[in-house]
Each structure stands twice: as C-alpha cells, then as structure tokens.
From Swiss-Prot:
ATP binds at G613, P614, N615, M616, G617, G618, K619, S620. The gene is mutS. GO terms for cellular component: cytosol. Belongs to the DNA mismatch repair MutS family. Residues 796-816 are annotated as: Disordered. One of its GO terms (biological process) is mismatch repair. This protein is involved in the repair of mismatches in DNA. It is possible that it carries out the mismatch recognition step. This protein has a weak ATPase activity. SMART domains: MUTSac, MUTSd. Keywords: ATP-binding, DNA damage, DNA repair, DNA-binding, Nucleotide-binding. This is DNA mismatch repair protein MutS. It comes from Pseudomonas aeruginosa (strain LESB58).
Amino acid sequence: MTDLSQHTPMMQQYFKLKHQHPDQLMFYRMGDFYELFYEDAKKAAKLLDITLTARGQSGGKAIPMAGIPFHSAEGYLAKLVKLGESVAICEQIGDPATSKGPVERQVVRIITPGTVSDEALLDERRDNLLAAILGDERLFGLAVLDITSGRFSVQEIKGWETLLAELERLNPAELLIPDDWPQGLPSEKRRGVRRRAPWDFDRDSAHKSLCQQFGTQDLKGFGCQNLTLAIGAAGCLLAYAKETQRTALPHLRSLRHDRLDDTVILDGASRRNLELDINLSGGRENTLQSVVDRCQTAMASRLMSRWLNRPLRDRAVLEARQESIACLLERYRFENLQPQLKEIGDLERILARIGLRNARPRDLARLRDALAALPDLQNAMTELEAPHLQALATTIGTYPELAELLAKAIIDNPPAVIRDGGVIKTGYDAELDELQALSENAGQFLMDLEAREKARTGLPNLKVGYNRIHGYFIELPRVQAEQAPADYIRRQTLKGAERFITPELKAFEDKALSAQSRALAREKALYEELLERLIGHLAPLQDSASALAELDVLANLAERALNLDLNRPRFVEHTCLHIEQGRHPVVEQVLETPFVANDLALDADTRMLVITGPNMGGKSTYMRQTALIVLLAHIGSFVPAARCELSLVDRIFTRIGSSDDLAGGRSTFMVEMSETANILHNATDKSLVLMDEVGRGTSTFDGLSLAWAAAEDLARTRAFTLFATHYFELTVLPESQPAVANVHLNATEHNERIVFLHHVLPGPASQSYGLAVAQLAGVPAPVIQRAREHLKRLETTSLPHEMPSQQSGKPASPMQSDLFASLPHPVIDELSRINPDDISPRQALDLLYAWKMRV
C-alpha cells in the first residue's frame, strides 16, 4: 500500500478505500461530481472519452484526475458495464458542516456486469446473468444467478464440450472461476471472467450460507443436496452478490436444480446457425424470436428467450402449453388479456430492486399501477378452462391492501429519485404534511415581508429572495445600499447590488430551512418504511410475476398462431417426424413472394434424406425450417406447418455455413470438421441432424470421402438426418443404406437463365446448375463460356455413374461426373492381391459371396 504520510488527509482517505477495491474503478463522490484519480482516471478518460486533468498535488506529485457529474452518472456507468468494467460507488455519508477533516465516505455499492440492477444499465429484453463454475475436466458444478429476478439455479455437467455449450446458451455477463485453476482454460476465453479465492468455493461454507439464505436446515428440498461441486459454485455466487450489493437479498428465495436430460440440447454452432435470438451478424433482426415474440411485457420476452434457448423434452409440460394456447385462441380470448397484461409492466425486475432496496419512486408507481390492473385480469381469466391456465390464475393474487397502500403513499407521477423528495402524497403522513406546509408557506411570507420592508424603508427597488448557497436575503441596488436601515446586516456583495439579512428574516430562515431538511428526512424515512413493507410480501408477489410472465408468453403464442397461420403439432410415442406443408417462419416474413411450403417424412424406415439441387435452390432453408419447426414444438408452441407429427428429440445439431476462427487459429475447414466430429460423437437415434455441404472446404476427393463416411456413420446411428450435398456420388447411399432416401430441390433453365422452383421432390437432382447460378451472380460472360468448355471436356473424360432414369421410358439427364469412377473398385483391388493357389475352394466361395454383396 502507498505510504500515506506524504499525502493530504483527503487522499489518505481515498487510498485506504481504493486499497479495498483494487480491481474496480472507484467513483469517489466530491460534491456534485464523482472523481476518479491516478490509474482509474487514466483508464476512465480513455474508455469514456472524458478529459484527463492534473490538479493540485499529493505526495509531491500532481494528481491525475477525471470527473463526471453526479446527475449524469448513469450513462457513464452503462458504458463501463457494457465494456465489462466494475465500479465501486463511494459516497459521502458524513455531514460536511460538522465534519472535522475530510467528509466521511464509504463504498455503498459495487456495480459489476453480472450484478447490475439499475433499469438504465440493463437490456430489458435480455437476462443479465452471473455464473460460477467449479470442477475439473471430467465433472463441473455450474451455478447461475439472475439478481434482477431472483432466479438461482445449479447443475452438474460432464466434460468441457457440454460445459462450454451451456455457457454459450446462458451467455453470462460475468463468470467466476477459482483462482487456483490453470491459466488458459477454455472458460477463460469468455468475457467477464473473474478469478476468486479458492476458499470462496468451499462446499461446507457454501452449504451453510445457502441454508441460512433460504431459511432451511439442508438443501434436500431443492433436490441438490448431493451436488457438492454445484453447491460450492452457488456459495461463491451468493457471497459475491452480497459483497457487491452491500445489503440482504430477500428476493433470493430458492435454488432450482436444472438437468440437461430434461432439455433438447443445442450446441453453440447450432444455436448460431438457427439464429434463435441473435442473427449471424450479431443483431436481433430476422431471428426466430423477432418473429414469434410480440409479448406485452419485457419479463415475458425474457421468458420467451429462455424457452427458445432451452427447449423441453417433458411431453406433459409441452402438451399443457399447447392446450393453453388452444384455449386462448377460442373466441380470440387472448385479445382481452393482452391489453391488461401490458399494464403489468416489468414486475419481475421491479420486485428485485425492491428486494435490493434500490427501487426508485417510479418503480413503486409502476408496481401500484400493476396491482391496480390485477383484479380485472383475474376476472378475465375465470373463463379459461385449460388446467394450466387455471393453475396460473390461482398463483396470481390481487393484493388489495398493497394496492391501496401505494395509491395513498405515492403521487401520480413521481420524480426519478427520492433524493430531493416530492414523492409522498399529501395526506399520507401528518408530520410530513406539517413540515412541508411550513416550508411551502415561505413564498407567501417572503412576499408579505417584501411589501412591509418597501413601506418601512421607502425603497421601491428592494427585493426579498433565496438561493441555495447563501439562503434568504434582502437585496438593494448598490446606489440605495447606503439608505439601508440599521437592522440590515450585510450578507453578500454583488457587482451592482448588496444583499442583507434582518433578525426577523434570519429567524424565519432557521425555521424554514430546518423544516425543509426535516421534511426531506421524514420523506426518505417513509419511503424506506414502504420498501420494508413491500419486502414482507415479496414471495407471493414474485410468484405472481412469474405466472403473469408465462401467461403473457402463452397469450403471445396464441396471437402468433392466429396471425402467422401456425398449427398445433402432435407428439407421438413411435419414432417419426412428419411435416406437411412446412414453412420457414422467418424467411416467410421477409419474402415479397409467397413462400413455397414443403413436406418432410422421416420414420423408422427412413432416417436420412440426402438433399441435392442447385445453390440458392432452397436446401438450407428446407433444413433450417425443419429444425425450427421441431424446436418450436419443443417449447409448446404451434408450428408453421399444415400438419406436424413428431416424437421427442434429445438434440438438434446443425453443420451449416462456413466461417473461420481466426482468433482460435482454426481454418474454415477445421471449424467444419470440429463441428462434424462433435455431431458424430454425440448424435443418437433420437437426435435431429442437419449437415450442409460437408467436406467442401478441402480437395474434392478428401471432401467426398469424408462426406460419404460421415453420412454412412449417421445412417448407422439412425439419427434423423438431412444431408445436403453437391457430391452427386452420395445419391447411391440408399443402395447400401436402406434407411436413406434421396430428395431434391427442383429448378429449370429458361433462355439460359435459371428459375428456382423450391419444391422438394423425391429422387436425386439431375444437375447442379452451377454455371447458371454463377451467371446469375454476375460472373463475366467470357468466364462462363470458358467454364462451359471445361465442363464439357470433364463430362466426356469421366464416366458418369449409372443412375435410374427420371421417368419410365425416358433416359436420365446427364449427371454430374462420378469422381470415384476412375478409382479402382475395392473388390478389384482385393482380387489383384489374392493368389488362387493359396486358398481353398471353400474360402474362394466365401470370398465370391462377400464380393457379390459389395458390388
């Protein structure tokens, strides 16, 4: 620590506080500014684009400093939090008038990316999560806390790949890991990683603190008593939250045990490729959520995002949601509910801020309005007969006493903060009313005093006024100042005037200013009492908020089903995926022409479709729409199809698109193969797999070989697979793999221009139309002509693989050249190595039968 003896008393105070918070920027309150000093000032000046100055000296050197106005701090804090910085807020808690030496200060709150709760610093439509992990390469405990809602969950996960996929799903703003973990682990590549002391993860201490937080003897009731690694991580989260918030956390009431087995697992690549809530450019436009989310409240939008990113495998829950949506669609009942739900607002985060004791007056006004809307909403729900909706209605209370309390206590349109008062209604508290009357009557007193003094002194330019620095005063022009009566005491000299005070005015000033400060203190005390009373009702209010958010999502899905022509899917026990007239929900919305719907049929007999056809023909759209239909079914939503029948899936994999990983030192092909390896290792017979153009990132023979082998492996796994390819050789797979079938996206050429028809038809494509697509893209005509010459030569020098004709009696169109045609057949290769004199007649017959099966 710096030698403090060489520094001024104020800087000594600063260094003592800064020493306790070395990793955070310190906002040090000085009057109407937050000041930053030394390295904090340099860093903040760079990040916030504010002026770096050097004022005064301490320890014999100029002090680098930067400041931001107290009243506009929120905007600067929001920017720092988005940049991943943490800030310690150091306030003046002493009275400057009575302080000897520097005003007493202390850190009242630490704002970090994962524990921020201020409305202005949060994205209202995204969860803001704090996570912690503990474990080794084989087993990890993961704890996740949303301090803005009170959701607190734990789970144990096997293996790095699964852990990283879960972290990608959650996308925590901050991630806590033990300080004794080795450097360079995969988790450290994430943003917002903070290393914490190993003892912060101690399991025994964690168990004790969690039981104390929830008021229980053990954690058995939460189903996580034996999750020792996850409990250690949860204990670290709880301690970190308390350390940063500097208050109790009454809104953290329980711990949920999440299980991966209950969900449809999507890895990071699949989540990105399907563009669930973030598009490939990092924005939110043209994502699945942008189409299916018309929720009335922000808390419902966040719930919708959680549903989309964590589809369920619990058929009972999914069918209960479907039944609820169907009920809300009857007689358009959702239309009555949605305007009332809009009045509820973001109840979830308002209640969290009340629990954290940093709720603002407008939070209480919004809570008042939400509680006032609940009785009408309850009445509207009485006609909903779906069991799940009835359960939600039972959970949603009305709280008439709290509604009345807030209606009496808070003015209609309160100010943003309690700091200057003006929040509590007249008539709520007699003592406050009396003090405010005394303060507010000052204006009339001053007018009367001014009239009397003008009459007494005969000075018509005399004025009586007030300012915050010098208090009350009588002002005379400089030329009349000499005529002031003897009882006028000089208070302030201005350029053209003199200000005075009289004993009468001084007595009034003492009384009025005392009343003003006492009124403000009383109002703040009443506000704190209100928060405490509300905290006593947090548990049922939070349960109501959760039920209201789910009701909002279900009403939204009913509205979307009506306006997007979505239909109810049917889950079945036997393995199948049948879709009639399926559509891509996002592409359909952006097309100016009608979307071409297509069917899909996978079942016990057909597990894989090899999809061929031209680029831009719709292969990727067809594959993605299948995955999105399956995913929507697994959140309980209706789906964009005329009819859908499916069994539950355990995972959705996608290997679509190509991009390199420059930061990780991986080429496009390496990324492609890594994703392919993950699929081949983890796909099961209950998985849905989308494979698009596997092998295109390397040489033709290597790529074709890899694609062929991968397709064979998936066929043996019996995963539901859509395998799009330009390797026409793969269309012979059905001959050796009975569960594989061919389909193609059709197109035609007209006047040497390609026309995409987008229909999915049985059988392989007749040609790829690659040159036509190149021409459409604007490749120069001489290049296209030269390519035609090369293509003609290649087609005549390579033997095409014999394929069945397209229609009975008509020869097939010329196929793409079989690049394997020039390779020796494996049977021929084996035959060339056999010496007939070395084998018996029986061995020769066995070989003959084996070769017969393979040819």
